């Protein structure tokens, strides 16, 4: 979720970005090989960002800097996380991909009850999605090595303490092993 050019390059160091995106191709390949539906989530706004309230400090900053405009280079999905033809891309205008989108409709229409989540930032889209999906009674798996946050301490605390209360927190290798019946 939110594996976008601006998200990876403007809010994190180059090392953080490289670490965050490194495992994503393997994660996506693992999901595809297991026959799982891969849904991509991005944040993007219409020209002028009319969806952004001045009371929303996170997205007001994006608006002020002209970021995350639909179709812009910065809003593009990073090539390592690129969608294949036919894979849904959910476009959101809030931190949670459930707010104001068709994500829940996609999940219900496809009888999906377990979500495997990964994204940047851990303190943003990952946390918001875990909380919202948990309230909707989804089983949750968060892929630790495919998540990142500008603040390493917050990232670790969220995964180890907060998110771990609602989701299984695993590595890409552990997930692949579980899906194929091999231990990692």
Model-assigned labels for residue ranges:
Residues 116-119, 137-152:
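A short glycine-rich beta-strand->turn/loop micro-motif centered on a GG-aromatic cluster
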Residues 122-129:
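Short glycine/serine/threonine-rich phosphate/pyrophosphate-binding segments
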Residues 33-36, 111, 137:
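Glycine-centered short loops/turns at secondary-structure junctions
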Residues 1-84, 166, 178-184:
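Active-site acidic carboxylates
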Residues 70-120:
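Internal catalytic-core helix/loop-beta-alpha segment
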Residues 38, 140-142, 169:
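Hydrophobic beta-strand scaffold residues
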Residues 150-163:
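Active-site-proximal loop->helix
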Residues 90, 168-175:
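Short acidic-hydrophobic, aromatic-tinged amphipathic segments that line or gate anion-handling sites
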